[in-house]
UniProtKB/Swiss-Prot annotation:
It comes from the Eukaryota. Belongs to the calycin superfamily. Fatty-acid binding protein (FABP) family. Intestine. FABPs are thought to play a role in the intracellular transport of long-chain fatty acids and their acyl-CoA esters. Keywords: Cytoplasm, Lipid-binding, Transport. Its main location: cytoplasm. It is found in: Cytoplasm. This is Fatty acid-binding protein, intestinal. GO terms for molecular function: lipid binding. The keyword Transport applies. GO terms for cellular component: cytoplasm. The keyword Cytoplasm applies.
Length: 33
């Protein structure tokens, strides 16, 4: 799993990725599976 945001690489747990496909951290975040 790889997440790309304006702040750079943001690591997330696999279980969190499975629960939500789109993660919003206050900035534009794109989730690529």
């Amino acid at each position: 799993y790889q997440l790309e945001s304006q702040e750079g690489f943001v690591p997330f747990s696999v279980s969190e990725i499975e629960q939500r496909v789109t993660v919003t951290t206050g900035s534009k975040t794109v989730v690529t599976l």
